[in-house]
Amino acid sequence: MLALISPAKTLDYETALPTDEFTQPRLLEHSAQLIDVCRKLSASEIASLMSVSEKIATLNADRFRDWKPEFDFSNARQAIYAFKGDVYTGLDAYHLKDKDIDFAQQHLRMLSGLYGLLRPLDLMMPYRLEMGTKLKNTRGHNLYEFWDDIITNQINEDLAAIKSELLVNLASDEYYKSVNEKKIKAEIVKPVFLDQKNGKYKVISFYAKKARGLMARFIIENQLNKAEDLKAFNTEGYYFDADNSSAKELVFKRDEQQA
C-alpha cells in the first residue's frame, strides 16, 4: 500500500537528524516555476494571499528569494524530519527504526503545495505554500490547476514501483483535492477518526490529525499491505467500527475519557 499524508505549517530545522541518508525531490522543475511566481510577490502581497502576519510574510518572502534547487544539509533537511505538526506528532519519525524509514521511503508520501509529492527522505528547503493558496501561475489560478495531473501521475508511478493496488488517504481534504481520484490506478481507502464528546462521536481536528499520523506509523511499523490489515489499528484508544464503515471508508472511534 501507499499512504498519503499532508505536510505541516510548522517546521523543525533545529533538532539533530537521526540519519544522513537523503534523496532529492523528483518534481523540482515544477517547484522552481512556482518559486519564480512567488518571488514576484511583496511581503504585503504574501500576507494578503496567505492570510498571515507581516512577520511570517517577510520570512517567507526571504525563503522564496533564497530558494535554490541545489539541496544539501546546509540549506535543507529530509521532509519527514522537517515537518512538525499534529500529524507528525503521531508519526513520531525521530523514533522510527532504520528499517521503518526504509519501508516509509517506499510506502509513505507527503503532499506539498511547493514540492508536489515528497518521499520521507527527500530534502526540502523551508517554505510555506499551502495547497489551497489561490496563487495565480502559468498554468491557472491556483495550485490545483498548476499541479493538474502531475501529482496523480507520480502516485501511479510509485504504486507501480511497489506493485501495489491500494492507496490509503490520510491527507486533509485541502491536500487530497490535488489528487485526481478517477485516474488513480488503485483501490482508495480513507480512514476516518471520530472522538466522543458530550456523548457524540465526531471529527475533532486536533485529534484526527494526530490519529492520521498514528495510523501512518502503524502502517510503517507493521509493514502493512492490505486494507483489511488497517482494521487492527488500536493505538491510543481507537477501535474499528465495522457497522459504520464501508469498503472505501474505515471508521475508527475513541470513547471519551472519564476524569
Swiss-Prot record:
<dbReference type="Pfam" id="PF03883">
    <property type="entry name" value="H2O2_YaaD"/>
</dbReference>
<dbReference type="GO" id="GO:0033194">
    <property type="term" value="P:response to hydroperoxide"/>
</dbReference>
<protein>
    <recommendedName>
        <fullName>UPF0246 protein ABBFA_001173</fullName>
    </recommendedName>
</protein>
<dbReference type="InterPro" id="IPR005583">
    <property type="entry name" value="YaaA"/>
</dbReference>
<dbReference type="GO" id="GO:0005829">
    <property type="term" value="C:cytosol"/>
</dbReference>
<comment type="similarity">
    <text>Belongs to the UPF0246 family.</text>
</comment>
